[in-house]
Curated annotation (Swiss-Prot):
GO molecular function (one): 6-carboxytetrahydropterin synthase activity
Enzyme nomenclature, EC number: 4.1.2.50
Alphabetized PANTHER family for the sequence: 6-PYRUVOYL TETRAHYDROBIOPTERIN SYNTHASE (PTHR12589:SF7), PYRUVOYL TETRAHYDROBIOPTERIN SYNTHASE (PTHR12589)
Protein name listed in UniProt: 6-carboxy-5,6,7,8-tetrahydropterin synthase
Pathway field: Purine metabolism; 7-cyano-7-deazaguanine biosynthesis
Matches recorded under Pfam families: PTPS
Cofactor: Zn(2+)
Family: Belongs to the PTPS family. QueD subfamily.
Length: 138
């Protein structure tokens, strides 16, 4: 198995419904996403994947949906819609609280399989840094 990793950075805001400290309030992070993909063999050029393809597909999706957006729990739709209508702010809703864990799981299990379904590689690992010192891995 041969693995390759691509790093993507994006800025987004979120809040955690029901959290008992400051994370219950709207706040933002400079997220760093590391996507590790794997294949059994390289292609005829000796690559698992052209890193440009990962950039085009994964970073393209992240830029369109997450970058400079609010990532909210679908239970926060009232707040999200008010912010969106007053400011034009992009809002992305998750089924669960937008913790780093849930964002990483959403990307690995729901988004990336669809983005990469026609490719000869698969996503093995997602690492999402919420801060330079804190990350989750799925």
């Amino acid at each position: 198995m041969i693995k390759c990793t691509r790093r993507i950075e994006f800025d987004a805001g979120h809040r955690i419904i029901g959290h008992q400290n400051k994370c219950q309030y709207l706040h933002g992070h400079r997220y760093v996403l590391e996507i590790t993909i794997a294949a059994k063999n390289t292609d005829e050029l000796g690559m698992v994947v052209d890193f440009g393809l990962i950039k085009d597909l994964a970073k393209g999706w992240v830029d369109e949906n997450f970058d400079h957006s609010l990532i909210l729990h679908q239970g926060d739709k009232e707040i999200g819609q008010k912010i969106e209508s007053h400011t034009g702010q992009k809002v992305y809703y998750l089924k669960n609280n937008p913790t780093a864990e849930n964002i990483a799981l959403h990307l690995k299990n729901e988004i990336f399989p669809k983005l990469f379904e026609s490719q000869k590689f698969f996503v093995t690992n997602i690492k999402l840094f919420e801060t330079p010192n804190c990350f989750v891995e799925v």
